[in-house]
Amino acid sequence: MESRAAVDDAALGREAWSVLDANSTGAATVPAPGLYPHQWNWDSTFVAIGLARWDTRRAGTELLSLLAGQWHTGMVPHIVFQPAREEVYFPGPAVWRSTEHRAAPHGVCTSGLTQPPLQALALWWVWRHAADRDTAVALVRRIYPMLVAQHDYLATSRDLGGGGLAAIVHPWESGMDDSPVWDAPLEALPPVRHAYRREEPSPWHPDSHHDRYMALVLGYRDSGYDPAYLRDEHPFAVEDPMFNGIWLASCQALVELAPVAGADAGPHREAVERIRAALLDRLWADGVFRARDLRAGRLSSIRTVGSFGPLLDQGLPADKIAELVGTLESASFMGAAGYPVPSCEIRAPQFDRSCYWRGPSWVNTNWLLRRAAAVHGLVGLVRVLGSQTLRLVRQAGFRECFDPFDGSGRGSRDFSWSAALTLDLLADTVEC
């Protein structure tokens, strides 16, 4: 097992800043050197969250650089490409062809997919913690209309099931790319073969689905990124509890931000109620939230870290909170992992301690669950998740993810959201 000498909080903070400075392009922060040379949606948003207590302007610049890629439909893309390195990553701009679409932003190359709509929660976090209040208020007023457009897009173009939830149309949109939850929807696709640039498959990813990933990309692209195609023909459509839990939390953030922007909070309150009711009606089963495969018409049998996303809801019924926390703290998740929270139920046959989103623990989902615990006044759980996450990065550095049993690092080194969220955790504030 790889480990390093213990570091104190001050040294850990300096290391985190060094990672973020090294990964900065000036306006944006790439996830990690080498493998991820562009700006990823929720990576960049977590960076803004981590910067919020320390540098209001830089956090705002991070969000604005991502939103420069927003489409006229309101969709915020999952990748904004850096012009100097467009062909370094596959699939790059030549595959997505966003510049050929009239709804895409002018002069910016992006993907055609989105990721969890965390931006409103991040903006609220920046506004809440800003030392520079004038800058924070100006930022809210500038970004708020963009977030309203984003949420309108999700409510209209992505309610593919007609029940009030947003559907993802590709595993990449979940942010949890290789989760076993996507296995069944992917395996239902017809066999397909596309040339994949990687000569040697990554040991961290299951390689069997990459051709299907590309088939989904090309089908959506060739439709002209048509929302009617997504509704009627696209073969992958899943209502994910983490995606929708984040959407609900961002709607709650917009309730707080609307008055700052001089807007009416009423529509956001209505959205909160609508999404909450839909989550409980459509995704709750056997004590947890489960992803719904819209094409197969069934719920996933697999419990993952995504099952706990709706815990971010301040208004979740008390009995559901108790059941979710009981499962989270059980031997299926935190109770049997020395370094929580594993991304897949430990007892599931699909669990793999080394494979992305099929077992390893992640700083970003730990942060989200810590935030969820704080929302519900679960001080003990807040402290455990905070201390155990800092233990991971102290021991293994700012890795992409971590073995849930021994804490060893997995994936990329010098990973930006791991560094940024460490800065937030080092503030050591239990916010309930």
Would you name each region that the model predicts?
Residues 236-275, 355, 360-381:
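Long, repeat-rich segments with strong aromatic
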Residues 100-114, 118-132, 368-372:
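Hydrophobic/aromatic-rich effector regions of fungal transcription factors
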Residues 44, 48, 116, 120-123, ...:
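TPR repeat positional signature
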Residues 50, 122-125, 129, 250-253, ...:
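Core register positions within helices of long alpha-helical scaffolds
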